[in-house]
Amino acid sequence: MAAVSVDPQRPLPVLLVSVSLGIYEDEHHRVWIAVNVETSHSSHGNRIETCVTVHLQHMTTLPQEPTPQQPINNNSLPTMWRLESRNTYTGTDGTYWRLLDHSQMGDTVQLTLDIIIGEDD
């Protein structure tokens, strides 16, 4: 399991609520944009796993126009995430998302979450 990078000077958002496709607002009215959504698939015997990783960045203002960095398809993302523990968020769809990174570089605060969904063949 990968180590979680957490910036202790910036608290994790407790709630992230979708205000538009790929745009979330936390409990302090800070805006977070899903700048990248990665999906990968792997098989283990009769089991197929899908891993979805989402990279969210804190923005001080909403973009007026979609940027090239914004993902085209956010259908796999819940409409709300709630922080359940130090490294786990629960989606409104009942999914559990693992916190991979919470860090800041310059003015950019990043939050990276992932989920692994297993299905039997």
UniProtKB/Swiss-Prot annotation:
Signal sequence range? none
* Gene3D superfamilies in alphabetical order: TCL1/MTCP1
Pfam family of the protein (one): TCL1_MTCP1
Indicate the segments annotated as coiled coil, or none if absent: none
- GO molecular function list: protein serine/threonine kinase activator activity
Say which domain of life the source belongs to: Eukaryota
Write out the similarity annotation. Belongs to the TCL1 family.
Q: Please give the name of this protein.
A: Protein TCL1B5
State the organism named in the record.
Mus musculus (Mouse)
